[in-house]
A protein has these predicted regions:
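Bacterial N-terminal signal peptides that target proteins for export
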Residues: 1, 35-45
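Boundary at the C-terminal end of the N-terminal hydrophobic targeting segment
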Residues: 13, 58-63
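Short, low-complexity intrinsically disordered segments enriched in A/P/G/S/L with frequent Arg
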Residues: 20-21, 26-38
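Bacterial N-terminal signal peptides
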Residues: 45-54
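Active-site beta->alpha N-cap acidic-glycine motif
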Residues: 61-181, 266-267, 284, 291
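Alpha-helical scaffold elements lining the catalytic groove of polysaccharide deacetylases
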Residues: 79-80, 141-167, 186-200, 208-258, ...
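C-terminal domain-boundary segment and adjacent tail
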Residues: 97-102, 206, 260, 270-354
Length: 354
């Protein structure tokens, strides 16, 4: 199942993590989740109120979540094709078993990191399983590094295989996810990228639940490679506990901003950790009264018609972006970072924080 593991430690999948900002127990302003915002007066306009509270006849969105998986074909510590094949097969079986629709966002540069034919077969397996695919750029770089023109070129370069596979399955390439959730600085760069995406038929996939699964995933890979079963089980338990707390926090944040539960969009990654945890993740969603829906269905929630006002270097989720638009604080007092033990293990496994 896992060939050449001991010698296979590489920077495979490094693109997802290298630009993540360092985490702190008290997020400073502009960090991953930003700091606590000064309390400001909330001025209600009738149209804004209808978006938040739901206009007459608006679609009820309580108890819904769309699962999105970044960095396909896989995010791993190891350039091992059997490992990638196994985790995707396990993940897809679990999603189908629990009737959870999902979309995977592809970095096409990964197709040549191991065996191109088998990597493409992984993407095809997602579509064969009834899932969807989207564009995550070719190289998982950012507008900050590439500039608007270079970033747009990287998006276009990330299309060909994904678009062809979708067409073969009677689908079109409609969805784009920004790497690191970095959407462009200054405003003119963000606007140029947004305009190009719109002109080329893309919709941006927001994030309204982010449980930092990437931080747990590589220590988990490392534990498997070292045949440390006790550590593997401990990391899995810590991840699931953290995920359940984090999902609950975002539900509270939704109540804070909107006075109701929106249809959530959850950011995950195509990892062995999520493959091994998919049954438990499904249980967490059921306990939190969340039913799986497609990304298209979740995006019908009126909240996603709100403007995204954020222009900044840090990638932040849409709850924080909307808190700026609505001039309303998020419940940062109850936010928890991943356990220090996990942060330290991540840095030992792959010390690539910027």
């Amino acid at each position: 199942m896992i060939s050449g593991f001991g010698a296979a430690l590489t920077a495979f999948g490094q693109t997802e993590r290298a630009r993540r900002p360092p985490k702190t127990s008290s997020p400073p302003g502009g960090g991953l989740h930003g700091g606590k915002r000064p309390r400001q007066r909330w001025l209600w306009a009738p149209v804004l109120a209808s978006l938040i509270l739901g206009a007459p006849g608006a679609r009820a969105a309580t108890g819904e979540v769309a699962l999105t998986f970044d960095d396909l074909p896989a995010l791993t510590l190891f350039a091992d094709q059997s490992y990638v094949n196994y985790l995707n097969a396990t993940l897809l079986r679990g999603l189908r078993r629990h009737r959870l629709p999902a979309i995977g966002f592809v970095n096409e540069n990964k197709l040549d990191e191991i065996d191109r034919t088998q990597q493409i077969a992984v993407l095809k397996a997602w579509l064969d399983a009834g899932m969807n695919l989207g564009n995550h750029t070719y190289s998982h770089e950012t507008p900050d590094k590439l500039g608007a023109a270079g970033y747009i070129a990287d998006i276009a370069r990330g299309e060909p295989v994904t678009r062809r596979l979708l067409k073969q399955h009677g689908k079109s390439l409609d969805w784009f996810r920004h790497p690191y959730l970095e959407t462009g600085v200054p405003a003119a760069v963000k606007r140029e990228i947004d305009n190009w995406l719109t002109a080329h038929g893309y919709r941006i996939a927001p994030v309204t639940i982010n449980a930092d699964d990437w931080e747990f995933a590589e220590p988990y890979d490392d534990a498997i490679s070292r045949h440390d079963e006790a550590r593997r089980r401990r990391i899995k338990a810590q991840y699931l506990a953290y995920t359940e707390r984090t999902v609950a926090w975002y539900q509270t944040a939704s109540d804070t901003l909107f006075g109701r539960q929106i249809a959530f969009i959850m950011l995950l990654h195509a990892t062995r950790l999520n493959a091994d945890c998919i049954d438990d993740i499904a249980k967490i969603l059921r306990r939190r009264n969340l039913k799986g829906v497609t990304l298209e269905e979740a995006m019908k929630d009126p909240a996603y018609r709100l403007r995204d006002p954020y222009v900044g270097h840090d990638g932040i989720d849409w709850m924080e972006r909307w808190s700026k638009e609505l001039h309303k604080d998020l419940p940062w007092d109850s936010w928890q970072e991943p356990p220090d033990e996990i942060v330290q293990e991540y840095d030992r496994a792959d010390n690539d924080r910027r």
